[in-house]
Amino acid sequence: MVEVELKFQIPAARRTALLKALDPKKSEQIQLQAKYYDTEDRLLSKSGVALRQRLEGTRWVQTLKAAGKSHIERFEHNHDLGELERALELDLNIYAAAPEAQQILNNALGDQISQLKLQFETNITRTLRVIEYEGTEIEVALDIGAIRTLEAEQEVHEVEFELKSGSIEQLLAFSFEWVKKYHLWLDVRSKAEIGNLLATQQKVSPAVPAKEFQLSKKDSAAKALCNLIAQQMQHLLPNIAAISAQVAEQDHIDQAQQALEHLYLSVLLFKNWHSGISDKWAHQLEAFNKQFEHLQHLQHMQSTLAAFLQNPTTAENLSKDILYAKEKLGNLVKSTQNVHHYLELLIFSLKEDVKSTQDLKTIAQATLQQQYKALQEQINQTEIHDFEQLDLLAVRIQELKFSFPILTSIYDVKNLQKYSKALNDAQLAAAEYQTLASSAVYIQQTELEASDWFVLGWLTAKQEVYAQKLLEATEQFLISRKFLK
């Protein structure tokens, strides 16, 4: 069985109002006591699997959950153990009659099934109500309680929206109404994940990295884009959740920025692949991503320029700007507007464009040709001292660096590495040029002491060096790309 649900965290100031909205007279309240099992080295958790026994009212239920194709869908197998005073010993024989569940366990545990043991427990009061919305039945469940190990405890206060019948689109639309009213923020971390972190005395799971995406020749252009967006959301949301929960490490911020940049470039460069792409998405994602880029540039300057700044006030102001940028980012990732963006992109990734009949290889080739043409036109009007045009050239290179491995995955071309290397050289020069340019702009806007003016001169000189490298590497790439007719 596939479970379709979304989970949100509730700001403390909105919790009472949300509980009232459920209307206790129309809601059911049940106690949920659960025991979660795993091996000492967390084989289930590492595979995105959770195994629990839970007292639901008067009955014990054994549940196996596994990650689905998106953060909105999960595999779930429930087995009613009956009305018992206490939970039975963990029984894995029940999965002999459930091939998919058995395969999930086998893949995760191998020959370590006997090593499963209790890792943590939860004690939750759940207030739930089924609400009909636009022909769709949605179960709203407010969970209040705690996750506990022998050494630690973490409060739970969250709301889940589960699709009981109807469309996923209506589930997401309904969820957003509650997001707006109660300032909810999307959290893809499960209770099992939080419990495992408590049990291993960690604050946060490792950052989720990007996965390589390859086009499937069997897909339409529209389906390919939906699959690409879905994969990018799988990359984005766990890292955004860590930032929203204020437990993120630098790698979570870096990975979230990369995911946002990839989403922005996907809806910008491939927008004619699918009629469901909104014109506003690229602008929204670009603006959001620029906040991450701003923080990244400030941190880069602190690590590379701080030692050169003679005036302590300049260095102090840079540190203050970094703290402010981090605080602003922490608020932005869980803002109502951005949570709405996440939900819109989730809706998009889960549906195909029924109007689209475009052949994937044809449109992929056309997209690549358009980018080459734009790059050629840009370099034709770019000179070494024209920083504005150099900025645009760097942008064209960054766009092509993103799209090239995706678009060329559908070609039967040997030695693509040669073209990739030429493009990579251009991209490295573009990235360094952009970093230097941003640093120079920041320094120019700062009230520098005379002793610090040499830093601006040094940046300008380095900027010109990498501008020349960018021009030369771009010319070399354009010469090398003869496989595209």
Identify the residue ranges that each predicted region occupies.
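Function-determining surface determinants
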Residues: M1-K485
